[in-house]
Amino acid sequence: MSEQKSSNQMWGGRFASGPDAIMEEINASIGFDRKLYAQDIQGSLAHAAMLAKTGIIAAEDHRQIEDGLKTILKEIEDGKFTFSRKLEDIHMNIEARLADLIGPSAGRLHTARSRNDQVAVDFRLWVKQELEKTAAALKNLIEAFLERAEEHAATVMPGFTHLQTAQPVTFGHHCMAYVEMFGRDLSRVRDAIERMDESPLGAAALAGTGFPIDRHMTAKALGFREPTRNSLDSVSDRDYALEFLSLAAICAGHLSRLAEEIVIWSTPQFNFVRLSDAFSTGSSIMPQKKNPDAAELVRAKTGRINGSLVALLTIMKGLPLAYSKDMQEDKEQVFDAAENLELAIAAMAGMVRDLTINVASMKKAAGSGYSTATDLADWLVRELGLPFREAHHVTGRAVALAESRKVDLAKLSLEELQSIHPGITDAIFGYLTVEKSVKSRQSFGGTAPQEVRRQIRYWKKRITKA
């Protein structure tokens, strides 16, 4: 009978037999939560130091625990640590190895602690550290866009709505649109860090502990602003993981929109940009091909990240307080999303910096599709005092005439324009060039080159403080 007893010495006391092989397989998380080894050891070191300072464990026990944990950290980092599925997770793998190294003193480490608050602090530490990495990556991407925006503040290109030519803008203005998007992403990252900057360590299983622990001490040691204020919520909460996935999904959406534009712009039909060899691949059969695979893969990774968010939302949606084993399924979603977001941001920063901009193609396209029609309507309002709706109607007739003649608006004769509205003068022709159009958009946040440069100056100052 003793041979049948559970082999897990961490919780096996009340069990008469060990788990079925299938139970062992479905219960084990060491295949993925080993990624938390550094955070688990970090949390245990802080917990042990606090136990010693408060007199809960002896100084000698603390010394042995600390030395043992540092040895384990080195073993893992050197690839010499053997992970066991029978021990389920990273917490018990480390604790079992600690017992091998230092003996009975290892059993004192878990005093006033549960795996519930242990995994909560490990995971929160990991997400917090990952958010800091995401912030740094986003800053790098924003800086890449600022460089290109400054370089092309006056480079004219078509602006689109419905992917149809709308009005001329500058490429610098287009770049600054992405600075705004990724700037909001960076702001969300900073907000998330601020919200999650509390330590759940010391909440124990769910109700706190009767030992005289110092949760403020461990929170400070682990780099948190303060401890969490409710032990039940502390072990139940995965909002920080959901928030990470949410902001990752929003950011991935921005990356995907950018990737789509790069894919379109790099086609021979558009010919706005040329991708560097460093971020392209070729075809195994068609020698002429230069494929935007990096951009396409960034676009595709959005699906994975969105899927991770939906998965964790679904996992958490009906769980009663406090901890349920369902929550073991939280980590793979976050790990996968973090890895793919980091890679996608880095790839996009590289692509943006390496893009060759075809200024001539952009300018030519900017003048097509009657892109200065709005400028004609605005002129009619300013110079002739027409209500905008009437000016819109007059301009629409001018566009229809130009289409029938198969010419641009600026190529219509004064007589043809006056046949639509007799008040039009030859002064209008100075307003129908793409350069004049973009220069006229001087409103705050507009596409005029001087306004683009002003926004660049603002963001350069802001990003240094982000």
Curated annotation (Swiss-Prot):
Keyword set includes Lyase: yes
Higher taxonomy: Bacteria, Pseudomonadati, Pseudomonadota, Alphaproteobacteria, Hyphomicrobiales
Subcellular location: Cytoplasm
HAMAP family: Arg_succ_lyase (MF_00006)
InterPro entries per the UniProt record, alphabetical: Arg_succ_lyase_C, Argininosuccinate_lyase, Fumarase/histidase_N, Fumarate_lyase_CS, Fumarate_lyase_fam, Fumarate_lyase_N, L-Aspartase-like
Name of the protein this chain belongs to: Argininosuccinate lyase
Enzyme Commission number(s): 4.3.2.1
One Pfam family of this chain: Lyase_1
Pathway(s) served: Amino-acid biosynthesis; L-arginine biosynthesis; L-arginine from L-ornithine and carbamoyl phosphate: step 3/3
Species of origin: Brucella anthropi (strain ATCC 49188 / DSM 6882 / CCUG 24695 / JCM 21032 / LMG 3331 / NBRC 15819 / NCTC 12168 / Alc 37) (Ochrobactrum anthropi)
Annotated family: Belongs to the lyase 1 family. Argininosuccinate lyase subfamily.
Keywords of the record: Amino-acid biosynthesis, Arginine biosynthesis, Cytoplasm, Lyase
PANTHER family in the cross-refs: ARGININOSUCCINATE LYASE
Catalytic activity: 2-(N(omega)-L-arginino)succinate = fumarate + L-arginine
GO molecular function, one term: argininosuccinate lyase activity
GO cellular component: cytosol
GO terms (BP aspect): arginine biosynthetic process via ornithine; L-arginine biosynthetic process
